[in-house]
Amino acid sequence: MKKIFLLQLVLITLCSCKKLDKPTVFDNEYATNFSIHSEDNRLSITSAGTNMQIPLDYKCKKCIITTTSASAYIDALGEINTIVGVCSPHYFYNTKIQEKLKNHSIEDIGNDGTINFEKILALKPDLIITDHNPNYEKILNQLSRQGIKILYVEEFMEIHPLGKTEYLKLFGTVFNQIKKADSLYSFVKKNYEALKEKTSQVTIRPKVFTGIMYGDSWYMAGGKSFLSTLFRDSGAQYLWDDTNKSGSVPLRFEEVLSKGKNAEYWIGAGNFKSKKEMLNLKYELCMD
């Protein structure tokens, strides 16, 4: 009897130790704006300063997205069919999404100014993936009270390109595709680091700048932004690399022209489809 009791005690102890050995945190390598913790058989996701809790076996079946970047992660994981609504559909260049918009398997639920509460409710999504848009907050709070989960994603705040890539893990968690997400992330990371090693040896670095005018200001990516890191790692010399900002830096056109006129490349020049569209008085000066 004592032997049976001791055996049971050992088994219980081993089981308890096994539970304690489970990881309680999914460690990020580059991303700083989200974290995932395991708590009492649930996953606690903190992203963009907000928290969402889901069961360990959670899998999103129907979602609404308000940002184009979310569609890229979802598509990479093979979960594009879970999207039932998007915001500002004219911004989406994904051909699968455009096709689904035409046949109404994906609905237009609003724009940057507002989202349609009744339409979203009728679509019955499990999850809304969005960013912090003050125009949405009141309606999102109402939808949250209806039991719809809200996941805030702001990958654009990351300061390293692989930090943005690492959001595959966040999307992999909510779509129950973590193995695929890890595999994709590792593949991109391996290739990125290999190319970075090659470009670290270059002696001639072309000068580049980015951005366009919005109103009276030219918004230039800061020196601590993911774009600045991407330019540096790809072998370019970013002319605003010395600005200590992770977001955009508003500049007067004259400031951009003074420094940018000697650049070899203007990268990320907005939504212009041709040089002709850019040839107004100011932009033409940048290309002389």
Segments from the language model and where they lie:
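Bacterial Sec-exported substrate-binding components of ABC uptake systems
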Residues: 17-72, 179-209
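Extracytoplasmic substrate-binding proteins
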Residues: 62, 127, 136-217, 241-242, ...
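A short, structured surface patch at a secondary-structure boundary
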Residues: 43-47, 56, 61-121, 127-132
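Flexible, glycine-rich surface segments
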Residues: 197-281
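Ligand-binding cleft/hinge of the Venus flytrap
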Residues: 79, 95-102, 144, 226-241
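Bacterial Sec-dependent N-terminal signal peptides
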Residues: 1-22
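Solvent-exposed, polar/charged alpha-helical surfaces in well-ordered, non-transmembrane soluble domains
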Residues: 61, 71-75, 118-122, 141, ...
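A short, gly/pro- and small-residue-rich
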Residues: 81-83, 142-154, 275-288
